[in-house]
UniProtKB/Swiss-Prot annotation:
This is 3-deoxy-manno-octulosonate cytidylyltransferase. Pfam families: CTP_transf_3. HAMAP family: KdsB. It comes from the Bacteria.
Length: 248
């Protein structure tokens, strides 16, 4: 099954300046992500960036770059610019791999593409079970609730679903009811084109979750349980230290 990986790599970061280029055991982080994408079997891999230094690092590693504007408000908007510049057909399967996930398993990159290709839906993503209370109550861990067919009902930073009977008695155990959303998406290129024509929704502003725009406009997102749990992403200097140790 043919698919394209696009890796948005925005240079500016308030918590970790120049994040795509931070060194992880002798390589820029963006190159590690590029290598994971290559292992997935993608037909084409494009790094979308707004910074020449990132472009040079990717090209030095033999990767393809698409220079994008610096004023995009979301990764999906950056993807849309690449889709137009590369003139992808509407049925092209695009996988958005975050540029700060150097430990993402190649298997789940392909999994999200396969899941999308097997369904008549414009967008697909992945989740993993939550087994501990700390993660269930952490607003930085985005939770997702599914319907009987595996389509998202809602994404939230809140603890959903709220296990009323359990939590009245005990906030230390969470049972088997929670899923943490992973920030990897598969789209058809035509769906990306439609997405960026929609006005941002009130819910996405409240939660700061751009995927809520899709649900707001009545579209479906398929969510599968990931075949592998990805390693730590890099948002902070502490994350970077942890990833360097894990990848040593």
């Amino acid at each position: 099954m043919s698919f394209v990986v696009i890796i948005p790599a925005r240079y500016a970061s308030t918590r970790l300046p120049g994040k795509p280029l931070v060194d992880i055991n002798g390589k820029p982080m963006i190159v590690h992500v590029l290598e994971r994408a290559r292992e997935s079997g993608a037909e084409r891999i494009i790094v979308a960036t707004d910074h020449e230094d990132v472009a040079r690092a990717v090209e030095a590693a033999g990767g393809e770059v698409c220079m994008t504007r610096a004023d995009h408000q979301s990764g999906t908007e950056r993807l849309a610019e690449v889709v137009e510049k590369c003139a992808f057909s509407d049925d092209t399967v695009i996988v958005n791999v975050q540029g700060d996930e150097p430990m993402i398993p190649a298997t789940i990159i392909r999994q999200v593409a396969d899941n999308l290709a097997q369904r008549q839906v414009g967008m697909a993503t992945l989740a993993v079970p939550i087994h501990n209370a700390e993660e269930a109550f952490n607003p930085n861990a985005v939770k997702v609730v599914l319907d009987a067919e595996g389509y998202a009902l809602y994404f939230s930073r809140a603890t959903i679903p709220w296990d009323r009977d359990r939590f009245v008695k005990d906030l230390e155990t969470v049972g088997d009811n929670f899923l943490r959303h992973l920030g990897i998406y598969g789209y058809r290129a035509g769906f990306i084109r439609r997405y960026v024509t929609w006005q941002p929704s009130p819910l996405e502003h409240i939660e700061m979750l751009e995927q809520l725009r899709v649900l707001w406009y009545g579209e479906k997102i398929h969510v599968a349980v990931a075949q592998e749990v990805p390693g730590t992403g890099v948002d902070t200097p502490e994350d970077l230290k942890r990833v360097r140790a894990e990848m040593r």
